[in-house]
Amino acid sequence: MGSYMNKTSVVKVGNVLIGGDNPVVVQSMTDTYTADVEKTVKQILALHKAGSEIVRITVNDESAAAAVPEIVKELAKHDCHVPLVGDFHYNGHTLLSKYPECAKALAKYRINPGNVGFGKKKDTQFAEIIKIAIANDKPVRIGVNWGSLDQVLLAMLIDENNAQENPLSLQQIMHKALITSALESAKYAEELGLAKDKIIISCKVSEVQDLIAVYQKLAKECDYALHLGLTEAGMGTKGIVASAVSLGILLQQGIGNTIRVSLTPAPNAPRTEEVRVCREILQNLGMRTFTPSVTSCPGCGRTTSSFFRELTSKVKDHLDEKMHTWKEQYHGVEAMKVAVMGCVVNGPGESKNADIGISLPGSGELPVAPVFIDGKKAHTLRGDNISEEFIEIVENYVKNRYGKK
């Protein structure tokens, strides 16, 4: 962890605690048409199985609002009780009022101050949602987005800034507008009677440096629980790297209580990728452990064979597949470290440092693969069945070390 931890209020969302000293929570969002109950339930189940601890769904029209209670019922049939967050823009006050069962079924409401209402209607419509949240004992995320920022507030801050002797840059004013919108909305929610421990706030942008600057300032100005993430991270490597860099820096500084990685999925790619990235960020920072880690070398001229890459892939896939049952049977197995190395240079050393590791022969080396367990050489594998034999050794290690004594 970093040199300090941003102490915040603790907010209960369904059965999940966010903020305070609680672990950083992984969130995700569906991209199905919410009124299609079957498809939405299927995707929520997949996201939850992948490790999402809270799932947000779009509630944008009456058919979506009417579907929410049915979605919750169907999830319960699968013994899935993941908290669902309703994502409201423009008409949340109307939908929550007209569909009280939707308001009851959701675990949290998300409001965007930039489009909850306009002109004289803004405060009234915001207040309607807050009062419904209070009546149903639900928390609220006040989520400000760069792309839908309150234009009246922004114009006012620009005018005030232009009158200053040493005006701020437009970028700094945008940062100020994001924070002001979030904090003023949160303050108004409290004035309406919503408790501080029912409020989570976020100020999302799409650029790494902007996100870091905004949240560093936001964390100094409040003690609300903070939802962290780029509002649109992008696709593929770009989206993953941008999210890992920005979230990693802030989390290392103790800023952020729950995260979502807003990736643009590649065509036909699983929605669960965003959950995997969240978990990898937290695990690589040492903040959470979800699944055994696999250390493997990148390969070089010494590792002319592709076998070490194939074995690494097989081991990783095996661990991921087994974790669904292992996490219930073997307490602590998620912290296990496995090494699959490709030659004698770093192979034995990395294998000894892992809980269990294998050092495969590189180019010109003897065709044998020593296996190290808890820092000591335990086996020597050779022949055509090294993959199967090593995976069997891993299985036995898990049972012996993490099984109930």
From Swiss-Prot:
Species for this entry: Francisella tularensis subsp. holarctica (strain OSU18)
Output the superkingdom of the source species.
Answer: Bacteria
EC number in record: 1.17.7.3
Entry note: cofactor: Binds 1 [4Fe-4S] cluster.
Check the record and name the InterPro entries matching this protein: Dihydropteroate_synth-like_sf, IspG_bac, IspG_bac-typ, NO2/SO3_Rdtase_4Fe4S_sf
UniProt keywords, alphabetically: 4Fe-4S, Iron, Iron-sulfur, Isoprene biosynthesis, Metal-binding, Oxidoreductase
What name does this protein carry? Answer: 4-hydroxy-3-methylbut-2-en-1-yl diphosphate synthase (flavodoxin)
Q: Which cofactor does it need?
A: [4Fe-4S] cluster
GO molecular function, one example?
A: 4-hydroxy-3-methylbut-2-en-1-yl diphosphate synthase activity (ferredoxin)
Q: What is the lineage of its organism?
A: Bacteria, Pseudomonadati, Pseudomonadota, Gammaproteobacteria, Thiotrichales
State the reactions this protein catalyses: (2E)-4-hydroxy-3-methylbut-2-enyl diphosphate + oxidized [flavodoxin] + H2O + 2 H(+) = 2-C-methyl-D-erythritol 2,4-cyclic diphosphate + reduced [flavodoxin]
Q: Does this UniProt record's set of keywords contain Cell division?
A: no
Purpose: Converts 2C-methyl-D-erythritol 2,4-cyclodiphosphate (ME-2,4cPP) into 1-hydroxy-2-methyl-2-(E)-butenyl 4-diphosphate.
Per the record, the pathway is:
Isoprenoid biosynthesis; isopentenyl diphosphate biosynthesis via DXP pathway; isopentenyl diphosphate from 1-deoxy-D-xylulose 5-phosphate: step 5/6
| GO terms classed as biological process | isopentenyl diphosphate biosynthetic process, methylerythritol 4-phosphate pathway; terpenoid biosynthetic process
Q: Which HAMAP family match?
A: IspG
**Binding-site residues, [4Fe-4S] cluster:** C297, C300, C343, E350
